[in-house]
Structures are given as C-alpha cells and as structure tokens.
Design a protein with these regions (language model features):
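Catalytic centers of hydrolytic enzymes
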Residues: 1-271
C-alpha cells in the first residue's frame, strides 16, 4: 500500500467538483485503486488522458455519488484501506479531507493508529464517531464499500446513509448520484478535467509529490502497537492472556503430576 499522487488528485477533484456543483461542503472524497485504469502523462494533459485514466463515463459507471456515513464507519473505511488491501489490491483507497497513519504490524482491522479530518484550510479536526459526514465517491467504490460487511463476514460495517441518517441499500445508491445545476450527472472524468482546468497549469507543483495524508510504517514498539487500540486488538490481547493462563495451569498440573509420581516412587523404594 502507498500514498498515490494520482489517487490524491482524483479524490481532491471529486471533492472540488461536487462542492462546485452543489454548493455543499464535502467532508471526505475517496477513490479506489480499482477505479484508476491508467497513469497520466507528465506535462500537458488532455481530456482523453483523463478519460482513459478514470472510469468510463457511460451509464451509471463513473458517476459520483454523495452519501453520509458516521465517523465510526469512516474509521472502518480507513481499516479497509489498511487491512483489506493486502488481500484485495483494488480495495486500496485514496482520500481527500482526511489524514491518517497505520502500522502494518498491528492487528488486522486495527492497523490505523491516527486519523483526523483535514479541512480546506489545512486545519485538523477530530473524527466524531457518532457524527454524520458527507462523503463523495464514484459508484464503483461506493458499491464496494457498501458491501464491506458481507465481504468481511460482519467484522466491519460501512453503512451509506441519507442526510437524516437513514440507511441506504447498496442497490439504491444510484438514487444518490450528484447532479450539477443543469441537471447533468457529475462524472468522475469530468470532475478531474474541470479540476485540472481551474488549476491553470499548477498540477505538477501541487501533485509532483505526496503530501503525507496517508503514512504507512512498520513498528513493533508496544506503545505504537497499542495506540488507539479498538475491540479487535483487545480481543486478541484477551485471547493471548487466556492462552498464557491456560498454559500456566497446564504446566502447573504437569509439574504436580510429576511430583506426585516421584513421591510415590520414593515411598515404594522406602518400603
């Protein structure tokens, strides 16, 4: 897993385009590795380059959707990126509006040890697990995240919701496509193209390197292994403690049994 300049560009473009089209502030925008089909050339970028790099803009493919998720589910989305990615590379996520880090040595589904919302002015804001956040993504990534509960055997849930917090079925996500003022659906490739046009040639300056919105590292430091631990780490610790106690009890029983046998043999010799 890694932070990607192209992934950052795509997610930033989604956020910008939807805010322009709707006037709403988007909390987080995201895209998945499975959406990025090709790289884009250095220097002059054409609409065709963007169209080929992003999903096809046909039918419901490539349309941006806007849904709400809780802060707890946003954290679960980060765990999808850190824990599911090694098993399914297309699940790697790239986000705008959030910065986070994860330790690859931590417990699965608890690899993320730091996460904050990164606002437009670069200020940081804690993620409220009970609050609803407006999230923008493409249809492909939205459907993938909506089926996380099934693919993770119920261990992780990411429930798309409407503005009132009512759950949205995955098959109903098409009802939450983002439209501009003219009534046209906002496509991923169009969002990226429009974003690049308004940058006025500064893409290389802004996206020539990553900006540490996703930091991946490896450490066996106990403090870092337990930082912001969740239920999965606590369950693992409880199981490990139980195994240690059981091992100690079994060892104690074996020692006592050996001791009794030796005592019995000693008594027999004395007789």
């Amino acid at each position: 897993a890694h932070e990607s300049t192209l992934g950052n560009l795509f997610s930033d473009a989604y956020k910008w385009a939807v805010e322009q089209a709707t006037g709403q502030t988007v909390d987080v925008a995201l895209t998945a590795a499975g959406v990025i089909r090709e790289t884009m050339p250095v220097g002059h970028v054409t609409v065709s380059d963007v169209f080929n790099a992003a999903s096809l803009g046909v039918g419901t493919e490539g349309e941006l959707i806007g849904v709400y998720i809780t802060g707890a589910d946003l954290m679960n989305a980060l765990e999808v990126d850190s824990s599911v990615y090694p098993l399914m590379h297309s699940a790697q996520l790239f986000m705008s509006g959030v910065e986070y880090s994860y330790n690859t040595n931590r417990m699965i589904f608890n690899k993320v040890d730091y996460a904050m919302l990164r606002r437009a002015d670069d200020s940081l804001e804690a993620i409220d697990k009970d609050k609803l956040y407006l999230v923008v993504t493409g249809m492909y990534a939205g459907q993938m995240l909506g089926s996380v509960e099934e693919t993770s055997f119920g261990l992780l849930t990411i429930t798309p919701r409407d503005a009132q917090g009512n759950p949205i079925a995955v098959e109903d996500l098409e009802d939450y496509v983002v439209y501009d003022e003219a009534g046209n659906p906002v496509k991923e490739w169009y969002a990226i193209t429009s974003y690049l046009q308004q940058m006025d040639g500064t893409m290389e300056e802004q996206y020539g390197q990553v900006d540490s919105r996703k930091v991946i590292y490896e450490s066996w430091n106990p403090a870092k292994l337990l930082r912001n631990a969740n239920k999965f780490t606590y369950i693992l610790l409880a199981v490990m403690l139980l195994l240690i106690l059981l091992s100690a009890l079994i060892l104690r029983w074996i020692v006592k049994r050996i001791g009794r046998r030796k005592n019995a043999e000693q008594i027999k010799k004395e007789k």
